[in-house]
């Protein structure tokens, strides 16, 4: 049988800075590019149609770029066992090339099974690191230096002109390749996948949008324009983190951009930091990273189904909370501060275990990245024992970051006639005012699902009491030893600690 290479695309849907593809093409053997829509992931609670639409769009962009070199990605709906076995019936798979995936437990178990299958079939599986993430790292010793070295190294750009492509179709293998029609049509308000869209978005940021980045990052309205908007393209690998970082460095001296680029550079570093954290302790998909909190969370309430549904659909009666959730449902995007607020409302004000909302928000975030999602969710829920407890006040957030009410008015049309500042606390309206501003007396905005002031006090008392417990503090020391680099001696006693930035 003819010997071939197989390049398995997963969350690296691009043709540039792609070490697995570069290595496969260098070997000279016929190379098959493969993407699997795995039933295991299609049915996983973290994913929804918006993710697979974005993946489909990304694959179509790759195939457009491959047309000139007469290549094509084989796109199949199948589990890996069936697909690889069908290919192995026709060809001798000499080697499989892919990026390491810092993913959910189900993908890790899949990879363990694949490694065993490769060993049984005498197939070499070449896995390449994701960005600067170190597989199995137990400490952060020299991690920052490693990050800089990786990010400043030359990109691994495959020479597609010399590619020896192997083209197969799913029918030949007796496999499915049908794609739902809903994946093939764009959804209004949702970003479109593909490397071409990634680069266009990045270039637009450096050309004009990015000047206001550092001052607009907290506003749910302004952030939609001024933030990089690169998160889904990084999450699905339409562009590599290194490509984005090196492009940022090229613009470092552009007038008017320095403060924004310093802020963005910091966030690219934190991007890898959180994924490394998940890689080093992936059990946090199921338990609190600070294990002492698991028994404490048994005291959390099971929110009434109606209350949880109100949070999920954006009908809590808290204007900014509802506006944010409805925006997220419609567009797949929300700036970091508002995401944190949604988690705080669920876990603090409603006193619900973070696990009750973690997969739901994953379904909504177009940029869902397991390695960022779980550490961030737990940090905002206040169950790490190492981070500052942040209990968000939605009214205060609205007053500060939507001061004219534009965002709320757009996403909560029920309050279109309500003026500022009453818009931020509509439950203070008198019946006469409600009638004047066309708010029905049965509206949740006159009687929200929670009392923000009372619930915040209860959460504050609860969380601070927990954080002082010896078991929580002991776990916190373990977490710091594993996930945080040792601080260098301060040159001045007044030098401040680094604060974690907002991540958008």
UniProtKB/Swiss-Prot annotation:
Cofactor note: Binds 1 FAD per subunit. Binds 1 5,10-methylenetetrahydrofolate (MTHF) non-covalently per subunit. The occupancy is 0.2. Binds the FAD cofactor more tightly than the MTHF cofactor.
Tagged with keyword Transport: no
GO MF annotation list: deoxyribodipyrimidine photo-lyase activity; DNA binding; FAD binding
Disordered: annotated segments: 483-504
InterPro entries on file: Crypto/Photolyase_FAD-like_sf, Crypto/Photolyase_N_sf, Cryptochr/Photolyase_FAD-bd, Cryptochrome/DNA_photolyase_1, DNA_photolyase_1_CS_C, DNA_photolyase_N, Rossmann-like_a/b/a_fold
A GO biological process held by the record: nucleobase-containing compound metabolic process
Cofactor(s) required for function per UniProt: FAD; (6R)-5,10-methylene-5,6,7,8-tetrahydrofolate
Pfam family, one: DNA_photolyase
Signal sequence extent: none
Keywords: Chromophore, FAD, Flavoprotein
Domain Photolyase/cryptochrome alpha/beta per the UniProt entry, residue ranges: 3-133
Function of the protein: Has no photolyase activity.
Family, similarity comment: Belongs to the DNA photolyase class-1 family.
Protein name per its UniProtKB record: Cryptochrome-like protein cry2
